[in-house]
Curated annotation (Swiss-Prot):
Record-annotated disulphide pairs: none
Residue ranges of the region described as Central domain: 62-132
InterPro entries hit by this protein: Chorion
Any one Gene Ontology BP term: chorion-containing eggshell formation
Family: Belongs to the chorion protein family.
Annotated segments matching region Left arm: 19-61
Domain of life (superkingdom): Eukaryota
Signal peptide feature range: 1-18
Functional note: This protein is one of many from the eggshell of the silk moth.
Record's protein name: Chorion class B protein PC401
C-alpha cells in the first residue's frame, strides 16, 4: 500500500517540477534531458515537440510573474493601489503599465516652492484585455498540437521543437 501512495506522489511531484521549469530546466521534466521520450533521440517530431522537459506551453501572461496583491480582509480586493510614502526631491519620472483600468492621484503636502503633476494616459485600445497565446488543439498529429501533417511538420518537427537535449526548440 505504501508503493501505491508513494509512486503516484513521486510522479505528481516530477510533473509539477516539469511544469514550473517549462523549456529551460535541466532535464527534470516528462522525458529527461538528452534523448527523446521513446528512444528516438530528439528532432524526429514524435513527441509533443515543445521542449520535452515538461510541456512548456500555457498562457503567456503566466511567464512574467504576477503582481502580488495581498489582502487581510475576508472579502477579496476590488482595486489595486500603488503607493509611496517616500520623500523625493528634484524631478521624478515614473513610467510603466498597470493592469486593467485605474486612476492616478497625488496626495500629500507639497511645499509652496514645489509643484506636483500627473500625466496619465489610458490604454492603446485594448483596455483590460490582454492578447495571450493559448493552448493548441492538443491532438496527436493532423491539425492538433503536432501541427499540420502529424509527425515532423508541426511544432514537433525539425527546427521548431522536438525532444532535443533539454532546451527544446532553441537547439
Amino acid at each position: 500500500t505504501k508503493s501505491i501512495l508513494i509512486l503516484p506522489s513521486a510522479l505528481m511531484i516530477q510533473s509539477a517540477v516539469g511544469q514550473c521549469l517549462g523549456r529551460w530546466g535541466p532535464g527534470l521534466g516528462r522525458c529527461g534531458g538528452c534523448g527523446g521520450c521513446d528512444g528516438w533521440g530528439g528532432r524526429l517530431g514524435y513527441g509533443a515537440g515543445i521542449g520535452e522537459i515538461g510541456l512548456g506551453c500555457g498562457l503567456e501572461a503566466s511567464y512574467g510573474g504576477g503582481l502580488g496583491v495581498a489582502s487581510a480582509s475576508a472579502v477579496p480586493p476590488v482595486g489595486l493601489g500603488v503607493a509611496s510614502e517616500n520623500m523625493y526631491e528634484g524631478c521624478v519620472g515614473v513610467a510603466g503599465n498597470l493592469p486593467f483600468l485605474g486612476t492616478a492621484g497625488v496626495e500629500g503636502v507639497f511645499p509652496t516652492a514645489g509643484a506636483g503633476v500627473i500625466n496619465y494616459g489610458c490604454g492603446d485600445g485594448a483596455v483590460g484585455i490582454t492578447s495571450e497565446g493559448g493552448y493548441g488543439g492538443l491532438g496527436y498529429g493532423g491539425l492538433g498540437y503536432e501541427g499540420v501533417g502529424g509527425y515532423g511538420l508541426g511544432y514537433g518537427g525539425y527546427g521548431l521543437g522536438g525532444c532535443g537535449c533539454g532546451c527544446g526548440r532553441y537547439l
